[in-house]
Amino acid sequence: MSRILSHAKKNYRKAIVIESLLLVVFYLLIYGWQRQSAVDFSYGFLSAFLPFCTFIFIIFYRKQNFSTKLTALYRAEAIKFILTMVFIIIAIKWLFVINFIAFFVGFLLALVLNNIIPLILNKI
C-alpha cells in the first residue's frame, strides 16, 4: 500500500509543478493582451489552485494512521471547500476583481487541471 501512496504522492507533486508552470505561462500570455485580465485570471486560478495544494498537503504530507486516512480525506475536502470560498470572497471583495469572466475562466481552468493532470500522469 505504501508503494501506491508514494507513487500517488509523486504524481501529485508533479501535477502541482506542472500547474504552477501553466499558471505562469497563461498569465504571461494574457498579460500581453490585457494586464488587468491577467491579474483577474490569476486570482481565479489561485482561488482553486491553493485549496488543491492544501488538500494534497493534508492527505499526503501529514503523519496519520491508516485507519484515520478516510477521516482525513473528508476533513481535507471540507477544508478545501471552505478555503475556496474564502479565496473567492477575498478576491471579489478586497482585491477588486474587475473582469469576472477572466476570473471564472481561471477558476474553472484550475479546477479542470486539478483533475486532468493527475489522471494523465497516472496513465504515463
Curated annotation (Swiss-Prot):
Main localization category: membrane
TM annotation in the entry: 14-34, 41-61, 85-105
Bilayer topology term: Multi-pass membrane protein
Cellular component annotations (GO), alphabetically ordered: plasma membrane
InterPro entries to which the protein is assigned, alphabetical: ATP_synth_I
Keyword entries, A-Z: Cell membrane, Membrane, Transmembrane, Transmembrane helix
Subcellular location: Cell membrane
Pfam families hit by this protein: ATP-synt_I (PF03899)
Listed NCBIfam families: PRK06099.1
Protein name according to UniProt: Uncharacterized protein HI_0485.1
UniProt source species: Haemophilus influenzae (strain ATCC 51907 / DSM 11121 / KW20 / Rd)
